[in-house]
Amino acid sequence: MAAETLAIQKRRMWIVTQVAPYSHGPAGVHRVLAQANTALSELALIEGFDPCCVSDVTTINPSEFEAGGILALFTIGETPFSTVQRTAIFSSWRSSNLGVLGIHSATDACHNWPDYATIMGARFIEHPWTQSFPIETVNREHPCVLNLPKIWNWQDELYVFSALSKNAHILLQTSPNNFDPQIAGTVGDREVFPLSWYIADPGITFYTSLGHFPEAWESTQYLQYIRGGIQWIRESLNSRNSISA
């Protein structure tokens, strides 16, 4: 029974949608949180995980993170993980017991937690542009993006990030030449802007900056892309820890 219980815990996927102070008002990701919860829960079930929707991270026992699984974060602001929770998350991530799925504004969270940037691969700086733009799929052989064309158009907030971690591998990118020149933003001398990436060392992370609008969560292409990220995290965890998800 104990081994069976542990296996169930290792298959859990926490779906954290804690966005204070952006839970009210005309702007912010709160408009799609219900859609995201539903879609991510369905994808978790399809991929063999037990979804657990969380709007208050203080309710999670840190030992649950140590058991492993996937921590899916659609967050913004100072998500109130306790010191013990942070330690458990970072340790479990580094040991590849816990994979992390970052959605959209998750890079604009936990600014007072230095290890969080290591887990995510970068920190959000600003998003001056909200527009349609062409996206280039950089590595079409990677499982996360197998369903995506080489070049495709999308409408979303265009995030500007701090320098990517050396461990982050870009999956999707766009050119600053595509940005609306009438809107000022931090372009600098960057030739490309990353939109999505993965980390495989020391821990396992898949991140996408896309997903601000309801249309994303109604898009079969977008949902298949997110499913690809979940599949890749699962298989990466399995290969390192022989976890049957």
Language-model-detected regions and their locations in the chain:
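Glycine-rich, charge-decorated loop segments at or immediately adjacent to ligand/cofactor-binding or catalytic sites
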Residues: 108-119
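Short alpha-beta junction capping motif
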Residues: 65-110
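Extracellular ligand-binding/catalytic regions of CAZymes and related secreted enzymes
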Residues: 4-12, 17, 46, 179, ...
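Aromatic-Pro/Gly-enriched surface loop or interdomain linker
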Residues: 2-67
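Catalytic beta-strand/loop cores that center a nucleophilic Ser/Cys/Thr
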Residues: 41, 122, 128-202
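Structural recognition of the beta-strand scaffold that forms the well-ordered cores
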Residues: 14-16, 52-53, 70-74, 99-102, ...
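Solvent-exposed loop/turn segments at secondary-structure junctions
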Residues: 20-22, 58-59, 77-80, 106-110, ...
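Histidine-centered active-site/metal-ligand motif
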Residues: 24, 29-31, 104, 127, ...
